[in-house]
Amino acid sequence: MCHAREASLGTGEPEAAPRDNFPREAGSKRGIGAAFETRAQRFLERAGLALVARNVTVRGGEIDLVMRERDGTLVFVEVRARANSRYGGAAASIGVRKRMRLLLAAHAFWARTGGANACRFDVVAFEGGRLVWLRDAFRADDAG
């Protein structure tokens, strides 16, 4: 599958988010998820990434956001939100099964678009009123 660039490790600084993580105006669970995806997308665009696709659905999985770094690296982004950090919080909620589904979906997208670019898997987590960007959160070889 895709390969990571050497300099892709590290985490972003937490960004203050509205005190209430769950916007009431979104209503449904799907609406709330879409609101968080929009917030994550805007944050990543301000950080210099460009949107390639959103809510990519392929057999077996979905990718919340596909972004592109300035150097061409494809960034597959999982957006997670939790009202509190009980049970490990938002980022910890991405288990082995979820990572496998993300990898399958990313591989299908990557292959469909030519498969030439480096890529990585990031997580944008909303937790306790904060946005945390976990760059290179996991790799294809440690998903299982």
Swiss-Prot record:
User: Record's Pfam families?
Assistant: UPF0102
Region (Disordered) location: 1-28
InterPro entries (UniProt xref): Restrct_endonuc-II-like, tRNA_endonuc-like_dom_sf, UPF0102_YraN-like
The GO molecular function terms of this record are: nucleic acid binding
Q: Extract the SUPFAM superfamilies matched here.
A: Restriction endonuclease-like
Point to the regions of Basic and acidic residues compositional bias. 16-28
PANTHER family from the entry? UPF0102 PROTEIN YRAN (PTHR34039:SF1)
Query: To which protein family does this belong?
Result: Belongs to the UPF0102 family.
Protein's name in the database:
UPF0102 protein BURPS668_3819
Species for this entry: Burkholderia pseudomallei (strain 668)
